[in-house]
Amino acid sequence: MNPLLLAACVLVTAQPDFEPTSAYTVQAIEGWTVYVHNKLLTEKKDLGERTLKLLGARLYDITRVVPGPAVEKLRKVRFWVEENPKVACACYHPSRGWLAGNGFNPEKEKSIEIGGPGNFLGWAACQPNMVLHELAHAYHHQVLGYDQPDIKACYKRAVESKSYESVLYYQGGKKRAYALNNDQEYFAELSEAYFGTNDFYPFVLPEIKEHDPEMLKVLQKVWGK
């Protein structure tokens, strides 16, 4: 092989699969650090402005309902906002190793990525507490720990009782609750209902009290309210 061609191939294969951190502009929104991809500030400015406006509104809402000490911990969680075809809407990234192995910037570890801003905007009406949901994942991971025994015990009870196997869904009818996927989703879904509104029953706090009173006690304990 031509040495120059070989060198070019090496350079190409050495390129990372992800956008470098230098491709983002750092902003402060409601006390949170937000990395905004520069394309959403230039080429797709309208999409970027609408996404950041909604994110700001959701973060403001969180500061109004979540107890202050918990908010201060949540504010340590960074956001990354961009168009990333690997992310349908928004997700929390707990693992640096997973990020590196799947073509994501490892610096997104312990951060929330809004990689599908179009869906983030489009799904806002039916999932108004999406940002809180992802922050609850971060809180579970970074503050409480995934081995938090009370959450695990309540999740185990929920699975064994089958009380979430067929619950009301916001569009009508009944479905298997998303909370049953694992104890992490259980905590995030119930946190949505605790502080606001979820798209699966229990939708709001009084319904948690009726449907899952032991988990209500846990939510009060871990969130400090």
Language model regions located:
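Metalloprotease/metallohydrolase-associated module, dominated by Zn2+-dependent proteases
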Residues: A100-N119, A125, Y155-K225
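Acidic/His-rich structured neighborhood in mature extracellular/periplasmic domains
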Residues: H37, E49-E160, F203, L216
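Acidic/histidine-rich, surface-exposed loop or edge segments in extracytoplasmic proteins
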Residues: V26-E49, G116
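Short, solvent-exposed loop/turn segments at secondary-structure junctions
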Residues: L41-T42, N84-V87, A193-F195
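A generic hydrophobic-helix recognition signal that picks specific residues
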Residues: Y24, C126-M130, Y178
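Sec-dependent N-terminal signal peptides
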Residues: N2-V12
